[in-house]
UniProtKB/Swiss-Prot annotation:
This is Basic phospholipase A2 PLA-B. It catalyses: a 1,2-diacyl-sn-glycero-3-phosphocholine + H2O = a 1-acyl-sn-glycero-3-phosphocholine + a fatty acid + H(+). One of its GO terms (molecular function) is toxin activity. It comes from Protobothrops flavoviridis. Expressed by the venom gland.
Length: 122
């Protein structure tokens, strides 16, 4: 669920997700096209691809269960859809954390009209 994803991002990065990631680069937030602008934008590209692979459920609005153990996100539960969605969100949140050093403020509210490179496939 998007609210759970927001909490994961906040825990992993310390950043406010809506301000920092909702409009970042060419892939963070709604939609996505062109070539990812940097490693953080690539996290969003990979997250979009991960969601595309989850079939038979709506990854953005279904709730899942997770916990934090020693700073690590642990996805819990049995239903396939919820577990896989949690794993997609977990990987993206960790990716954001791992790329904090290369986060660029200039991509924070990047207009998608500048995302003109050919779109990569998953």
């Amino acid at each position: 669920h998007l609210l759970q994803f927001r909490k994961m991002i906040k825990k992993m990065t310390g950043k406010e997700p809506i301000v920092s990631y909702a409009f970042y680069g060419c892939y963070c937030g709604k939609g996505g096209r062109g070539k990812p602008k940097d490693a953080t934008d690539r996290c969003c590209f990979v997250h979009d691809c991960c969601y595309e692979k989850v079939t038979g459920c709506d990854p953005k609005w279904s709730y899942y269960t997770y916990s934090l153990e020693n700073g690590d996100i642990v996805c819990e539960g049995d239903p396939y859809c919820t577990k896989v969605k949690c794993e997609c969100d977990k990987k993206a949140a960790i990716c954001f954390r791992d790329n904090l050093k290369t986060y660029k403020n200039r991509y924070m509210t990047f207009p998608d009209i500048f995302c003109t490179d050919p779109t990569e496939g998953c």
